């Protein structure tokens, strides 16, 4: 089912959707310009940009109860996250800025039965003057350390239960009223105990399975006592129809059926804690990744990148403490901390992290020009902390030379952080060339566009590995802020991520060769795709492509000779249209408009043209998909 109404969720009627329908070029511009008719139509949005209605409702309740005059609030998943947010606010607005922090938690389960559907949920609420709220929202967006919509719904439900119990306690006369309140509490119990179909006790096992899939790129069969009995599901496959991705609610946590076979786990719990798994790199680069000590899960992909950046800054702080009597406890935010390097034109919030939480060299071309610029920086004697790079980049699908970066890293003692969200675990093996690999699990790993999460993998052979392991165990290091229901949903969605990735690779190859490549020089000025962007990109990508099942992925970008043809093409695409990528259904957006509307001239210097349309290919029937693009081409050309 295609979302066609401005502001509805993608997929339609999906409570926890991570994309929103902006079906025309004009609607996307209207969204960026803040047109009230567009903004008021939004039912959802990408979670770091659009505060979900459940989170808004929770904040309104807490604000009504705890805020002071002219204060606004936002919820965060832990006190440590809230404290980092407070630090960011004070750095950006001044030390005198008033920031209040309130810690809250829901009740713990009282017995073994309650553990099936109840979990103590701790959140921290940050209160600031309303005029400071946009700065706090920046932290939420850039850091990705957020409260999920499922977590907010759980807290709202617990608040409702508590409220009903309190009402019952306050009624001390009138049997009629007491009976009504008792009935309400009984109804709440039944809804909570039997209405929730996710077993909270399985959350830790679900997280282990996710980490293991990331470590091994293999989905193993779930044993008879595992998660396969907890829920079934149906997500996109060809039998659902060429563009039918379900009715909406079925993509959430309700009754779902699957013809994807469950798979078996041979080691769990205590036995799994010491297990390691072989990465499928080339023979001379083989090493083992332990899913329990080398793989970490986060509430978003940006949170994993933000944590990698924090880890590196804390490492640099050790250098500074040894070399000076520095009293300032502030970590990052510019000198005397070393600069990082952003290699290539990245997703917007990655660059924001490097700029707003420290300082950075932005080498936006991401090619030999940028490599020469990096070498000039290194040859000048400047010591850099780390190079951040996407593999490949979004939206230009450029691939930097990871082998050369690794050589320079060893020579000049800097670290490499790779975001391989676009390439994906199945298609590329970048860990041998990186110290840290980050990824958004919201994308192809999940596919169903109904949960947000991220991962960070430490290279056991990396130069910073020992420090990183220790840092992750410190008070300021790693916290597991991935809510249990999100983990259960992600585990379910990712059971077939390998097969889906292979199918997407095939669909994209067919679409490009059969329909789009013949239009280069006619309608399209250029197609950006790892095998097409440039000879250097193809060579660099091929050097890290997985030997088993690897392909070029499902993301490509199109540029046009004139913007009117771009608008006609986009408006006539009979597809879901909105932000995000890696969905099981094909998704398109005018990327420069939606991501860089306030800086179109600046990003054009790096090749991100205003007319650029980004497409993320899904699992639809390839013939149907080709016909959809062919019709849009004909409309754009006036045929």
UniProtKB/Swiss-Prot annotation:
Pathway: Amino-acid biosynthesis; L-methionine biosynthesis via de novo pathway; L-cystathionine from O-succinyl-L-homoserine: step 1/1. Keywords: Amino-acid biosynthesis, Cytoplasm, Methionine biosynthesis, Nucleus, Pyridoxal phosphate, Transferase. It comes from the Eukaryota. Disruption phenotype: Leads to a clear growth defect on medium containing cysteine or glutathione as sole sulfur source. GO terms for molecular function: cystathionine gamma-synthase activity; pyridoxal phosphate binding. Its cofactor is pyridoxal 5'-phosphate. One of its GO terms (cellular component) is nucleus. The modification N6-(pyridoxal phosphate)lysine is found at residue 443. It is found in: Cytoplasm; Nucleus. Its EC number is 2.5.1.48. It catalyses: O-succinyl-L-homoserine + L-cysteine = L,L-cystathionine + succinate + H(+). The keyword NAD does not apply. SUPFAM superfamilies: PLP-dependent transferases (SSF53383). One of its GO terms (biological process) is transsulfuration. Catalyzes the formation of L-cystathionine from O-succinyl-L-homoserine (OSHS) and L-cysteine, via a gamma-replacement reaction. In the absence of thiol, catalyzes gamma-elimination to form 2-oxobutanoate, succinate and ammonia. Belongs to the trans-sulfuration enzymes family. MET7 subfamily. Present with 2070 molecules/cell in log phase SD medium. This is Cystathionine gamma-synthase. It comes from Saccharomyces cerevisiae (strain ATCC 204508 / S288c). The gene is STR2.
């Amino acid at each position: 089912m295609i979302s066609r109404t401005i502001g509805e969720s993608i997929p339609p009627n999906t409570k926890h959707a991570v994309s929103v329908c902006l079906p025309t070029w004009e609607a996307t511009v209207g969204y960026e310009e803040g047109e009230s008719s567009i903004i008021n139509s939004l039912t959802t949005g990408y979670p770091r940009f659009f505060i979900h209605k459940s989170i808004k409702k929770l904040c309104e309740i807490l604000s009504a109860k705890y805020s002071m005059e002219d204060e606004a609030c936002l919820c965060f998943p832990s006190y440590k996250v809230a404290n980092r947010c407070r630090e960011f606010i004070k750095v950006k607005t001044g030390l005198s800025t008033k920031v209040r922090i309130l810690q809250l938690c829901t009740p713990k389960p009282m017995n073994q039965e309650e553990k099936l559907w109840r979990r103590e949920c701790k959140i921290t609420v940050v209160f600031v003057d309303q005029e400071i709220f946009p700065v706090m929202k920046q932290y939420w967006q850039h850091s990705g350390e957020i409260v999920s919509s499922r977590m907010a719904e759980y807290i709202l439900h617990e608040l409702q239960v508590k409220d009903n119990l309190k009402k019952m306690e306050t009624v001390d006369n009138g049997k009629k009223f007491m009976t009504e309140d008792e009935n309400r509490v009984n109804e709440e119990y039944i809804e909570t105990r039997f209405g929730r179909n996710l077993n909270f006790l399985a959350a830790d096992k679900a997280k282990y399975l996710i980490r293991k899939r990331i470590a091994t790129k293999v989905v193993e069969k779930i044993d008879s006592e595992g998660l396969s009995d907890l829920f079934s599901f149906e997500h996109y496959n060809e039998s659902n129809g060429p563009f039918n991705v379900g009715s909406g609610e079925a993509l959430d946590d309700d009754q779902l059926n699957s013809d994807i076979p469950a798979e078996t786990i041979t080691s769990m719990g205590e036995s799994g804690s010491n297990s390691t798994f072989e990465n499928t790199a080339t023979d001379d680069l083989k090493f083992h990744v332990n899913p329990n000590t080398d793989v970490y899960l986060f509430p978003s992909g940006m949170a994993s990148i933000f944590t990698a950046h924090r880890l590196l800054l804390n490492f640099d702080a050790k250098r500074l403490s040894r070399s000076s009597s520095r009293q300032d406890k502030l970590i990052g935010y510019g000198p005397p901390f070393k600069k990082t390097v952003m290699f290539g034109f990245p997703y917007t919030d990655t660059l924001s992290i490097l700029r707003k939480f420290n300082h950075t060299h932005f080498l936006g071309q991401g090619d030999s020009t940028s490599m020469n610029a990096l070498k000039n920086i290194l040859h000048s004697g400047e010591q850099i902390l780390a190079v951040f790079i996407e593999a490949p980049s979004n939206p230009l699908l450029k691939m930097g030379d990871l082998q050369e970066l690794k050589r320079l890293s060893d020579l000049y003692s800097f670290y490499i952080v790779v975001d391989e969200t676009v390439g994906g675990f199945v298609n590329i093996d970048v860990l041998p060339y990186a110290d840290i690999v980050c990824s958004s699990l919201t994308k192809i790993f999940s596919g169903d566009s109904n949960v947000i999460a991220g991962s960070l993998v430490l290279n056991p052979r990396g130069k910073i590995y020992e420090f990183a392991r220790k840092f992750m165990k410190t008070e300021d290091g790693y916290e597991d802020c991935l809510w249990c229901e999100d983990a259960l949903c992600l585990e379910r969605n990712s059971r077939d991520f390998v097969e889906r990735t292979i199918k997407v690779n095939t669909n994209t190859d067919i679409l490009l060769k059969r329909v789009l490549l013949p239009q280069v020089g006619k309608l399209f000025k250029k197609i950006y795709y790892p095998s097409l962007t440039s000879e250097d990109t193809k060579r660099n990508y091929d050097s890290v492509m997985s030997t088993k099942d690897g392909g070029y992925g499902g993301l490509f970008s199109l540029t046009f000779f004139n913007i009117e043809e771009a608008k006609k093409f986009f408006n006539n695409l009979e597809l879901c249209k909105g932000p995000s990528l890696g969905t099981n259904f094909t998704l398109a957006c005018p990327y420069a408009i939606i991501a860089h509307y306030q800086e179109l001239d600046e990003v054009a210097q790096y090749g991100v043209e205003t007319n650029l349309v980004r497409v993320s290919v899904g699992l639809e029937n390839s013939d149907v998909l080709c016909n959809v693009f062919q019709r849009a081409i004909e409309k754009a050309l006036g045929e």
